[in-house]
């Protein structure tokens, strides 16, 4: 398998119904699988997936392990060259995978990348979670292209260049599975939030590169 798109879910039945159709529709390829890793949901998520999305692979976890360990456990059951850690509230667009696949295929020194992320409600603006790639200032504060503190910019093509970044957002993290495993995966001590920054930091410490691919 070339790519596994893995969505972590916890009691998000309605959210999956809303956003999963775009992922399935825009990820049709014999070399791409779409997986939902269910983090011990108590709602009807698993039953709904089985009935309404038979093409989606379901990975059932025994309880809510949080974001980091939930993904670590799920990715133990995945075998693909690349994996995409995709939030359950992300709507993807046509051909979203191809630019990232092509770039990683051509640049073996790059461990991970992210697409441009725009707001789902105001599509002309960047999304707070990741925008156009993440950095860390000299005081250790994380920020993004397209976002300063709580203010997001309008996307006017100002960040349409492929650029090395310090960290890629966990909302849509495209990563080589080998790099993920060699770096030790996400740190479970980060139950939720900041875990992707820590992972990217460790990848960079190993001499690997992180890139934003705004064509995706």
Residue spans for each PLM region:
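Short, flexible, basic/aromatic active-site loop/helix in glycosyltransferases
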Residues: 115, 133-165
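Short beta-strand/loop segment that forms part of the nucleotide-sugar
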Residues: 31-40, 59-61
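Short aromatic/hydrophobic "clamp" motif used to bind/position activated sugar donors
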Residues: 83
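A conserved acidic beta->alpha catalytic loop
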Residues: 22, 38-47, 63
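A short, conserved alpha-helix in the catalytic core of glycosyltransferases
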Residues: 160-216
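Conserved donor NDP-sugar-binding/catalytic core segment of glycosyltransferases
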Residues: 91-141
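Glycine-rich, basic loop-to-helix element that forms the pyrophosphate-binding segment
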Residues: 60-78, 88, 99
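Short, acidic, metal-binding catalytic loop of nucleotide-sugar glycosyltransferases
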Residues: 21-31
């Amino acid at each position: 398998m070339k790519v596994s798109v893995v969505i972590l879910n916890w009691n998000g039945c309605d959210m999956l119904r809303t956003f999963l159709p775009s992922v399935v529709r825009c990820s049709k390829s014999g070399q791409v699988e779409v997986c939902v890793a269910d983090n011990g949901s108590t709602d009807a998520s698993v039953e709904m997936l089985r009935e309404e999305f038979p093409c989606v692979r379901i990975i059932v976890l025994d309880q809510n392990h949080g974001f980091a360990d939930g993904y670590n456990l799920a990715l133990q059951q995945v075998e693909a060259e690349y994996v995409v850690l995709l939030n359950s509230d992300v709507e993807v667009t046509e051909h979203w995978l191809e630019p990232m696949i092509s770039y990683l295929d051509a640049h073996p020194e790059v461990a991970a990348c992210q697409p441009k992320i725009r707001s789902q409600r105001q599509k002309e603006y960047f999304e707070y979670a990741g925008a156009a790639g993440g950095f860390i200032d000299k005081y250790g504060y994380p920020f993004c292209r397209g976002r300063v503190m709580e203010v997001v910019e309008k996307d006017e093509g100002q960040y349409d260049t492929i650029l090395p970044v310090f960290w890629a957002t966990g909302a849509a993290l495209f990563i080589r599975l080998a790099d993920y495993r060699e770096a030790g995966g996400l740190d479970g001590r980060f139950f939720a939030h900041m875990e992707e920054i820590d992972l990217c930091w460790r990848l960079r410490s190993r001499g690997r590169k992180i890139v934003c691919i705004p064509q995706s």
